[in-house]
Amino acid sequence: QVWSFVVDSRDPKRILAGASPIDIYRSDDTGATWRKMPNPNIPERCKGPFQPRVMRMVQNPARPDEVYAALEIAGAARTLNFGESWDDCSPHLVELSQKPHLQSKIVSDSFAEGMLDGHAITMSAADPDAVVLACRMGLFRSTDKGATWEDMELKRFSPVTYGRDVK
C-alpha cells in the first residue's frame, strides 16, 4: 500500500512513494516506471496490529536531495540523496518517551509508541535547517537533521496534543 508521495521540486519527473510496510519507491519518469529503493532498515521498536508505514514525506526547500519521512509507529527517517539511502531519525524520540508526559501505548507493546507515531512532517523555506514532526504526543522540531528533537509543548494550549497534520 502506498501512503505518501513527494515530487522533486527541481524535476517533477522524479517522485518518491512511501509505502507500508516501510518501503520507498522512486520514479524518474513521472510514474511510468518505479524502482524499489534500498530498504531504510528502520528498527522495529513497537509491535502492533499493523505494519509501520510512510505517512508523509517532505523535501528540504534549500537542499532538495534531503527528504524526511514521518513513519507511523516507527518515528522518522531522512535521506540526503533523494531516496538512495536512509537514516533513522528516531533514537531521540525514543529517549524522549522516557518522560512520563510523553508516554503513550494504544496498539503496541511499547510506551514509546506515541512518540514514534509519526503522522506528518514539514519544512519551511524560511528556516530550511528545521524539520517539524507531528506525532501523537504533539509537535517536535529538529534543527540537526533529526538527531535530536525539541518538544514544541502544545500542552500549553490544549490538554490534547494528538498531532495529525502540520504544514
Predicted regions mapped to residue ranges:
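Extracellular glycan-interacting surfaces
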Residues: 1-167
